[in-house]
């Protein structure tokens, strides 16, 4: 990237997401409790205080945006462990908020790039869910190391097969490209074929294809129409 990357304020959502997960788990078990499958041994039939506290968690619903992300990821990757779906949804939710990018746009980009396949490798060598080139991934990881103190040990091309790392770097990259080009279509085109190529075409008033951006934005509109599941 030609433009110097700037530091972005960090928004910590890990705790909120963890609470959301716990609330979801509890909600799933509420019907069993209310149906009388939990029975008190006390003479008055009262539910012990510690159980009442757990049941009260029903009032704390997970963020709707997180639930929508989770449902979309799960619809494409029902073949993987539930814990992995949580992990992917979590990083999309947190990093999108941190970088002020609509998570549905991130999901659309992932859909077009890899169909949510974390082990995808393109003929050009781009890897992972957001199809990041190894050299670009290494540069992005080094930049995040300076900003956030984050750096995966012994970065290798295969490091990009980890969906959490891949998504974190991909969202950061998309944010920076949008800052550089100030236009979503151009940022998406640069994500696809490199910022140097797009910068050259902009400076020399050369024609460029909107095909990739159109695919992403079409998927984005479809995801925006997806109804959030009711828990």
Regions from the language model: what does each represent?
Residues 54-231:
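Catalytic glycan-binding domains that act on GlcNAc-containing polysaccharides
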Residues 1-86, 221-231:
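N-terminal secretory targeting signals
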């Amino acid at each position: 990237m030609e433009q110097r990357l700037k530091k972005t304020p960090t928004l910590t959502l890990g705790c909120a997401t963890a609470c959301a997960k716990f609330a979801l788990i509890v909600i799933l078990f509420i019907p069993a409790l209310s149906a009388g499958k939990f029975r008190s041994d006390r003479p008055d039939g009262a539910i012990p205080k510690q159980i009442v506290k757990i049941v009260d968690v029903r009032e704390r619903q997970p963020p709707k945006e997180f639930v929508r992300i989770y449902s979309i990821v799960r619809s494409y990757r029902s073949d993987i462990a539930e814990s992995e779906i949580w992990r992917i949804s979590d990083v999309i939710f947190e990093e999108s908020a941190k970088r002020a990018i609509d998570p549905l746009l991130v999901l659309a980009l992932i859909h077009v790039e890899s169909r949510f396949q974390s082990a995808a490798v393109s003929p050009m060598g781009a890897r992972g869910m957001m199809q990041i080139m190894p050299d670009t991934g290494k540069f992005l990881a080094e930049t995040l190391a300076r900003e956030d103190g984050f750096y995966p040990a012994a970065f290798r091309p295969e490091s990009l097969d980890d969906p959490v790392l891949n998504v974190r770097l991909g969202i950061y990259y998309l944010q920076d490209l949008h800052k550089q080009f100030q236009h979503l279509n151009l940022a998406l085109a640069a994500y696809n074929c490199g910022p140097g190529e797009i910068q050259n075409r902009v400076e020399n008033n050369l024609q460029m294809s909107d095909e990739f951006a159109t695919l992403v934005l079409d998927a984005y509109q479809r995801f925006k129409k997806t109804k959030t599941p009711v828990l």
